[in-house]
């Protein structure tokens, strides 16, 4: 009897070990083959996750393609800042502006759409990078050496450019993804470098136009996680 119980116990142990190993192999395979996107969505850290809110100001950072919006009329005790890399934009129509509609955002979790007047300025934070050799490892790394700042108006002058046969295209008035044009210091940047129904489509159109990826896409791939140097903090340029 004891011998039978021993054999049974060994069989059960072998089966359990086989299942556990199979489960471990599956997990390892999934982790080693993550889905890669040109616009990875960060885990939601915003306390505002739903609703429509007026927007006081907006900032775009080309280190990672992240937008930060300052909202108005958020619930009491809720921080007014909302950050996302998944932002669509649309221009307010002339009718909406005449009716007194202000700049606003529609938020749904990590995704949001920003509806703005043609003269709305988004602060553009540009990260100037250099490739340097790490003295400890001897490997080359791309780091941020300073930041510059300008303003970007995606739809300024764009409506006139969309007139075809006397009719204004409705493309600008429905939410789409937009990629900023190549960063330029000095005067306000206008228009956009690429657009599309998806972020990847906007990136592709940008690359067709400039024969290079947008700064945010390039920086996400090359920047060192700890690549903010002392000069970055002290040499901001506006």
List each language-model region with its residue ranges:
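Positively charged n-region of N-terminal signal peptides that target proteins for export
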Residues: 1-4
């Amino acid at each position: 009897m004891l011998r039978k119980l021993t054999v049974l116990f060994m069989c059960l142990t072998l089966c359990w070990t086989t299942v556990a190993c199979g489960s471990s192999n599956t997990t390892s395979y999934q982790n080693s083959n993550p889905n890669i996107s040109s616009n990875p969505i960060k885990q939601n850290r915003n306390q505002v996750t739903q609703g429509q809110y007026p927007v006081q100001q907006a900032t775009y950072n080309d280190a990672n393609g992240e937008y930060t919006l300052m909202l108005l009329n958020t619930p009491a005790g809720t921080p007014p800042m909302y950050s996302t890399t998944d932002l669509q934009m649309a221009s307010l129509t002339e009718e909406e502006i005449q009716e007194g509609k202000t700049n606003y955002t529609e938020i749904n979790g990590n995704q949001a759409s920003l509806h703005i007047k043609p003269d709305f300025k988004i602060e553009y934070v540009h990260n100037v990078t250099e490739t340097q050799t790490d003295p400890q490892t001897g490997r080359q790394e791309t780091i941020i050496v300073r930041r510059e700042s300008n303003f970007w108006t995606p739809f300024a002058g764009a409506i006139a450019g969309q007139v075809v046969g006397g009719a204004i295209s409705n493309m600008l008035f429905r939410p789409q993804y937009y990629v900023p044009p190549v960063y330029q210091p000095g005067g306000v940047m206008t228009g956009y470098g690429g657009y599309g129904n998806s972020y990847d489509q906007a990136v592709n159109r940008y690359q067709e136009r400039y024969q290079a990826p947008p700064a945010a896409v390039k920086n996400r791939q090359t920047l060192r996680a700890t690549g903010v140097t002392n000069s970055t903090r002290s040499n901001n340029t506006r």
